[in-house]
Amino acid sequence: MEAIGVLMMCPMSTYLEQELDKRFKLFRYWTQPAQRDFLALQAESIRAVVGNSNAGADAELIDALPKLEIVSSFSVGLDKVDLIKCEEKGVRVTNTPDVLTDDVADLAIGLILAVLRRICECDKYVRRGAWKFGDFKLTTKFSGKRVGIIGLGRIGLAVAERAEAFDCPISYFSRSKKPNTNYTYYGSVVELASNSDILVVACPLTPETTHIINREVIDALGPKGVLINIGRGPHVDEPELVSALVEGRLGGAGLDVFEREPEVPEKLFGLENVVLLPHVGSGTVETRKVMADLVVGNLEAHFSGKPLLTPVV
């Protein structure tokens, strides 16, 4: 398979890059100063694209690669892949489901605790020597809080199971009511937010879920409510979120994702009721290795004429 051209869209895992380089003719797209010229020159050689949640395969790229057979994404979400164009062109698509569920769900619980118990602020308080002059202010407990989840898929369900260990009542909004759960279902996000202390965004990014967290939802969650986003940045109307936090209309937020990563609204930096993470939901050594193996495994299966491990298209 050494002659098969694989286009890696951006830096991802060093391990993934090494494994691809061992098996294929690897092209590193981000290193090319003149990318259009590069594509024109190598178009006949590239049969696979490896992307992630930041850089995938849009219609323009797919059209520029006439020999493209497969897009293997180093992510669960495929919002950076034009699935309709792939179907039209007969291009296969794979992702890395299931393997990152635990890490992302764990992080959601960590964000909830960090916001409610002000863990980051407590750490700063000790480090700057303030404890010597008085105790830190009281915080808010997590146990027993009403947790609402937008999207009860693999990750949403894993968050729910973890929150249950804290005796939290669970409710959810999804495209349809789930038949095999006793969690309370709400038919609108506003209704869910109105009945939640903590609202967790865990759904895929689609045109319908873009800005699913808007002013109406934020106001329904209210000045004691907490928003946790482990989905995608564009799920949240970021200017509305910033305004609500600054004005005290929302109690707090834990954010692993942002609308224009790596850009983050500077107004969030000085707010002690906000915890900000650099999109590290699946960022553990163990999980990233398994994800990389799945990307490589899908490519090897495709080019060996075997069934794909995690087919999407």
Curated annotation (Swiss-Prot):
Keyword Endoplasmic reticulum: no
Family label: Belongs to the D-isomer specific 2-hydroxyacid dehydrogenase family.
Record: active site: 232, 261, 279
InterPro entries: D-isomer_2-hydroxyacid_DH, D-isomer_2_OHA_DH_cat_dom, D-isomer_DH_CS1, D-isomer_DH_NAD-bd, NAD(P)-bd_dom_sf
Name of the protein this chain belongs to: Hydroxyphenylpyruvate reductase
Enzyme Commission number(s): 1.1.1.237
A GO molecular-function annotation: hydroxypyruvate reductase [NAD(P)H] activity
Superkingdom field: Eukaryota
Record field: catalytic activity: (2R)-2-hydroxy-3-(4-hydroxyphenyl)propanoate + NAD(+) = 3-(4-hydroxyphenyl)pyruvate + NADH + H(+); (2R)-2-hydroxy-3-(4-hydroxyphenyl)propanoate + NADP(+) = 3-(4-hydroxyphenyl)pyruvate + NADPH + H(+); (2R)-3-(3,4-dihydroxyphenyl)lactate + NADP(+) = 3-(3,4-dihydroxyphenyl)pyruvate + NADPH + H(+); (2R)-3-(3,4-dihydroxyphenyl)lactate + NAD(+) = 3-(3,4-dihydroxyphenyl)pyruvate + NADH + H(+)
Function: Catalyzes the NAD(P)H-dependent reduction of 4-hydroxyphenylpyruvate to 4-hydroxyphenyllactate and 3,4-dihydroxyphenylpyruvate to 3,4-dihydroxyphenyllactate in the biosynthesis of rosmarinic acid. Rosmarinic acid is an ester of caffeic acid and 3,4-dihydroxyphenyllactic acid. NADP is the preferred substrate.
Record-level GO cellular component terms: cytosol
Entry keywords, A to Z: NAD, NADP, Nucleotide-binding, Oxidoreductase, Pyruvate
Residues the record lists as binding NADP(+): 152-155, 174-176, 230, 256
Originating organism: Plectranthus scutellarioides
This protein's record includes keyword Oxidoreductase: yes
Any Pfam family: 2-Hacid_dh
Gene: HPPR
Signal peptide limits: none
Broad EC category: oxidoreductase
